[in-house]
Amino acid sequence: MLRWAEGKSAIVLARPGTCHPVRLDGAMGDRHAAPMNLLLLRNAQVHAPEPLGQQHLLLGGGRILWMGAELADLPAALSVQTIDLQGRRLLPGLIDAHVHVTGGGGEAGFRTRVPPQGVSRFTRAGITTVVGLLGTDDVARGPQDLLATVYALREEGLSALAFTGGYHLPPRTLTGTVRGDLVFIEALIGIGEVAISDHRSSQPTLDELLRLAADAHVAGLMTGKAGVLHLHLGDGPRGLELVRQALAQSELPPRVFHPTHVNRRKALFDEALALAAQGCTIDLTAFPVEEGEDAWSAADALLRYLDSGTAAERITISSDAGGCLPVFDAEGHVCRMGVGESGALLETLNDVVRRGVPLERALPAFTSNPARLLRLADKGRIRVGADADLLALDAAGAAHDVIAGGVVHVRAGRVEHRGTFENEN
């Protein structure tokens, strides 16, 4: 039950089981602070990811302040915006750990550079947290632009982080070393996407890969950040051999290595399953797969993973949004290309659920699993004290309401908050 205490100059929310009440009249000890904007979500079927049944949630200061099945009348003096979700499913906001926030591409000339996308492209897809990175083009695009774009997305209300480096070695950095970038720049949480088994890579050696992974690991220890090495996997026949050698010949923990695109070839996915059994977290990419192609869709791969008996927390799914999806001929020329879309994450989740997988079993790959790997303690779950990043689905599984940092970005399927240069088209 939500309990209130009303004094002469403050309204206090008392959370049962907590030691300290939460003041709703502004910052502690600052009588001139503006009141906290409060949002009450009523009648939500909460999947946290586990199902919690129908709950009411009070949001404020970017956090979930309270959650419960019973709700008392609110004090008349308290200004609260209310949204009745009418029994809709409420999920943690999706976490996309592989996004080309500055735009990717460039493999077929400068005209093929993908432009960056605005904040509403993410939020209308139910995504509230992104990790930006550089890919093939880490020359014309650099870490300064990447970091500036991350900060711009934050100013627009999205949670945004980034990996330092890119496809190639030596990695481009801001401080001169990847370890320095992770230690001294708050938004940088790992290294990536470093390309292996790909004709576009720098053909890194085992020693070079180990040095990068060690820098990521030590920086993670020093800062409490993710400290992961996010690895782009190409179509090369060597597959994950370098990672297997790294695990066999070093003391580095498997969690440091986070290979992505592992569903691009069926044999590569089998290799990735074996790595997950050793303790690595593997990442599927939600790209389109044509009939007869030697690849698994992200939905197919997730189903196979869940049926394999491998630890359910060691798989994540990302979109590669903003990245170019090229197809090459035998000479390495681009035959055709597409662009990764943020909406592919929610489409994949719905596809898996339609095939009979319970939502609470499918959802962690999009929420709590990436939050755990990236050490984002306040994300990926619906609980009191967590960030107020939430996604309410309509009956068809589309994003009906999206809340990022306690702010409504999508309401009843309509975008309420757009980026500075976004139009309504």
Which role fits each region the language model picked out?
Residues A44, G62, G87, H98, ...:
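Divalent metal-coordination and catalytic microenvironments
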Residues G61-I64, R381-N425:
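C-terminal cap of metal-dependent C-N hydrolases
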Residues G26, D30-R31, M36-L39, V46-L91, ...:
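Histidine-rich, glycine-flanked metal-binding segment
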